[in-house]
Regions:
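Activation targets extended, charge/polar-rich intrinsically disordered C-terminal tails
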Residues: 1-20, 206-298
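Juxtamembrane helix-break-helix junctions at the cytosolic face
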Residues: 18-29
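Internal/C-terminal transmembrane anchor helices
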Residues: 27-52
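Alpha-helical transmembrane signal-anchor/signal-peptide segments
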Residues: 51-73
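A short, structured loop/turn motif at beta-sheet edges
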Residues: 70-75, 131-135, 195-198
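Juxtamembrane extramembrane loops of integral membrane proteins
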Residues: 75, 80-82
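Glycine-rich catalytic cores of cysteine/serine-nucleophile enzymes that process amide/ester linkages
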Residues: 77, 88-186
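Soluble catalytic domains of enzymes that build or remodel membrane lipids, polysaccharides, and related
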Residues: 159-236, 243, 247
């Protein structure tokens, strides 16, 4: 499928173009150019024709995609395969898939969860946490749906190498999965939002989650990643003007953007807010606490 994280057609093109450059002075360079061009075009056509697949040998944590049903009155979202794993480490966990019904009139909070990638000040994984009461929060995260033995590559993600999934998890699952890794930082930013906006956003995102189960789509490192997918739903449901800015391009800056726009639900200044909403250590400390969602926000 790809070599060292780079799609085969790119590697093949390089392998052909380099010898051609060295043989430019030879009379028979033209056949090489023609052959290389044909091979490149064939590989490109095969890539364009490649379709995402629903059935593969998926890793356990994304084996069961969400099945979503909206009630006739539009007020209850029932979801099968909500993930509620108990994570001790990335490889040590108790698997649990449950069915949950979410009553939209109980929706009372929205948080943006940001996990900076390593020490990066620019790149991060972004998720949304919807609250239906103090300890009933559900996280929706657009992610790569990995096969067994597969690892993520930013370059490979540009060339139809991964399927996209909207993972729906309990907040404890989503945050402890990432918090099990010592040193991993997490930020939970409360967002100022009307219930009407939160409702339409939740319906939009869960609807897309269910649609991907039946109509799979490729993940794309630039156009269909964790942050661009969230932004598309926010823009679609927000009653106002919103532009594709640095918070989408560089999601590790999204906290700063939220604060500048007045969308962060706090009276603290930016530095104080970042310290207040830094939650990685609390996630690890209270992973098994019955009031997990409350404790990690204190």
């Amino acid at each position: 499928r790809f070599l060292i994280g780079v799609p085969s057609f790119v590697v093949l093109a390089i392998m052909i173009i380099v010898p051609i450059a060295a043989l430019r002075s030879l009379k028979w360079k033209k056949p090489f150019i023609i052959f290389g061009a044909i091979l490149f075009v064939v590989s490109l056509v095969l890539l364009l024709l490649k379709k995402p697949k629903r059935y593969k040998d998926w890793i356990e944590s994304c084996k069961k995609p969400p099945v979503v049903r909206l009630s006739k009155n539009g007020e209850v979202v029932k979801i099968d395969n909500v993930r509620e794993f108990k994570w001790r480490s990335l490889d040590d966990y108790d698997a649990a898939w449950v069915t949950r019904s979410y009553y939209l009139d109980q929706l009372d909070s929205l948080d943006l969860v940001v996990e900076p990638l390593g020490d990066s000040k620019l790149f991060a994984h972004s998720m949304l946490s919807f609250g239906f009461g103090p300890e009933r929060k559900v996280v929706i995260s657009a992610e790569v749906r990995k096969e067994k033995g597969e690892s993520f590559s930013l370059i490979a993600g540009l060339y139809k190498q991964f399927e996209l999934i909207y993972q729906i998890n309990s907040e404890r699952d989503a945050l402890t999965l990432r918090g099990t890794q010592e040193g991993t930082q997490l930020y939970i930013f409360p967002i100022k939002a009307s219930q009407a906006f939160m409702k339409s956003l939740f319906i939009s995102m869960t609807g897309k989650a269910g649609k991907l189960t039946d109509e799979p789509k490729f993940y794309h490192s630039l156009r269909a990643n964790c942050t661009t997918e969230l932004f598309d739903h926010i823009k679609k449901n927000y009653d106002g003007s919103i532009s594709y800015g640095r918070g989408v391009l560089f999601p590790a800056l999204s906290g700063k953007v939220l604060h500048e726009m007045g969308w962060m639900d706090t009276d603290l200044d930016y530095e104080e807010a970042m310290e207040k909403f830094r939650s990685g250590m609390r996630v690890r400390k209270f992973a098994d606490h019955p009031d997990f969602s409350k404790k990690i926000r204190e």
